[in-house]
Structures are given as structure tokens and as C-alpha cells.
Design a protein with these regions (language model features):
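Boundary/linker segments flanking structured domains
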Residues: 1-43, 47-55, 61-179
Length: 179
């Protein structure tokens, strides 16, 4: 699906290659974008776009906004990354090396007032749930394409590219041997 078909997303940046760094990619956020948008704690859906085509749909409510959410992808060559972020990091790197344009778009929804149960009763609080938004976005995509975006491996019940899954295993083996 082309990003042009999406009516609710805003572009927030472009992925770039990093030189001489463990992490192979970075994001250049749009300079004219209000910085508050990048760090706002609203529930958010992110769309990773390659040459105009949606490749990945994900969601988050992590503190620190879209910048914090994307740090999991940008810094996937350090620490103890899971397979999905590690592989997507390398897929973005591969696309950029092949001269593709890889962009980041975001969809947010306002917080809503809801009654939430605690241990001793309930209270009205503002909530920002991304899961329903993410599910709707994936469902909308599926209704048009009859599959999920290519990099949503789990939803598509597909294996990760074998070469990249091997790199993930090697990365963790090396990391554990250093301890």
C-alpha cells in the first residue's frame, strides 16, 4: 500500500545511513516539525515506508514520544535487541544501501477519558491506548492488501530472512561470550 493512500499519517523524518558506527542507521527528523510532536506521550502508530510503500506498521505508548520509540530500532545493534527490531534495522540499512528512500510516518489519537479500575476502586483518567489504533491500522491494511506489510513478519506468519536471523544469533553469541 502506498503511503499516499493513508489519510491520517504525518511524516516525521527520513532514515539515514550512519558511517563508522555500530548502529547502521539513524533518523533525520523534519526540521520544520514542532519538537513537541517528537516527544509527546500520546499513543502512536509508526509507519516505516520504503520508496512510498508501507513496509512496517507498529505502535507504542513509550514515554518520550516517537523519538523514544524509534530509539529501539536505531540502536538495535547495541544492548540486547529482540529479533524484530534487529532485523528491521538491517532491512532499513539494506534498503538505504540500495538507494531506496526510507521514511518514518506517524499517526496519533487524542487521549480519552475512561473509568479505570485500580486495587481499591475506580477513577476517571485520561488514557492513550495504542493497541486498538495499531489493530485498526493493520486491519485497514489487510482489508486492501490481503496481507500485512512485508516487515510485519509475525502477523504474516513468515520467518525472518535467514541471513538476518543468523546475524542476530551471531550478535548475541558474541555479546554473551564477552561477559
Amino acid at each position: 500500500m502506498n503511503i499516499k493512500d493513508v489519510k491520517t499519517a504525518i511524516k516525521v523524518g527520513d532514515f539515514t545511513l550512519r558511517k563508522h558506527h555500530r548502529n547502521k542507521i539513524d533518523i533525520k527528523y523534519l526540521p520544520n516539525l514542532d519538537k513537541k510532536i517528537l516527544i509527546d506521550n500520546l499513543a502512536r502508530i509508526y509507519l516505516i515506508i520504503q520508496d512510498g510503500i508501507i513496509k512496517k506498521i507498529g505502535g507504542s505508548t513509550s514515554k518520550g514520544g516517537i523519538k523514544a520509540t524509534m530509539m529501539f530500532y536505531v540502536s538495535a545493534m547495541t544492548g540486547s535487541p529482540g529479533v524484530p527490531r534487529f532485523v528491521v534495522h538491517l532491512l532499513i540499512e539494506r534498503a538505504l544501501k540500495n538507494k531506496s528512500r526510507v521514511e518514518l510516518f506517524m499517526i496519533t489519537s487524542p487521549r480519552t477519558l475512561a473509568t479505570v479500575n485500580g486495587l481499591f476502586g475506580h477513577k476517571k483518567v485520561e488514557i492513550a491506548s495504542f493497541k486498538e489504533m495499531e489493530d485498526l491500522c493493520k486491519s485497514d491494511y489487510y482489508s486492501r492488501e490481503k496481507k500485512y506489510p512485508d516487515w510485519n513478519f509475525q502477523e504474516n506468519h513468515k520467518s525472518y530472512p535467514p541471513d538476518l536471523a543468523r546475524k542476530h544469533n551471531l550478535y548475541h553469541r558474541k555479546r554473551l561470550n564477552k561477559k
